Amino acid sequence: MPRSRANGNFIDKTSSIVANILLRIIPTTSGEKKAFTYYRDGMLAQSEGNYAEALQNYYEATRLEIDPYDRSYILYNIGLIHTSNGEHTKALEYYFRALERNPFLPQAFNNMAVICHYRGEQAILQGDSEIAEAWFDQAAEYWKQAIALTPGNYIEAQNWLKITKRFEFE
């Protein structure tokens, strides 16, 4: 079983206390409680920049978690860590897996778009404008999906879509 950690951050301590109370009062199975504990410990480790520890906890949480909605957030967080580590192919894989279980994760679509946009910029630097355009088009598709789910968000993406004439807004 993972160790529960409390750091000096008041909000982290408070949310940890609330999570422990909820685990005791909400009717859940032993497996669900273990999965949540691993997920919580993964979030704590991730917030402290301990990505290896966070991944270990998230992988264990995915092994135990049976609810697709809850699994989607675990997979999304694994994608975040791979993005932070510059492992974009792995990150995209985990964002896709998260969206398979929960298609209403605009942040996953946004992060996928950011990766595609970055790859488009890299293709430009390598002198391959055709590949760059393909990456930018893919980024546009992902941003459109994120914006459709949360129209008031992703203003920079909306501006980029307008400037590049990839999407017209009303």
Swiss-Prot record:
Q: Record's InterPro entries?
A: PSI_Ycf3_assembly, TPR-like_helical_dom_sf, TPR_rpt, Ycf3/AcsC/BcsC/TPR_MFPF
Task: Please report any disulfide bonds recorded for this protein chain, giving both cysteine positions.
Answer: none
Question: Quick one: a GO cellular component term?
Answer: chloroplast thylakoid membrane
**Signal peptide location:** none
One biological process GO term for this chain? photosynthesis
Question: Where is it located?
Answer: Plastid, Chloroplast thylakoid membrane
Topology class, membrane: Peripheral membrane protein
Its keywords, alphabetically, are: Chloroplast, Membrane, Photosynthesis, Plastid, Repeat, Thylakoid, TPR repeat
Q: Where are the TPR repeats?
A: 35-68, 72-105, 120-153
Can you tell me which family this protein belongs to?
Belongs to the Ycf3 family.
Put simply, this protein is called: Photosystem I assembly protein Ycf3
Organism classification: Eukaryota, Viridiplantae, Streptophyta, Embryophyta, Tracheophyta
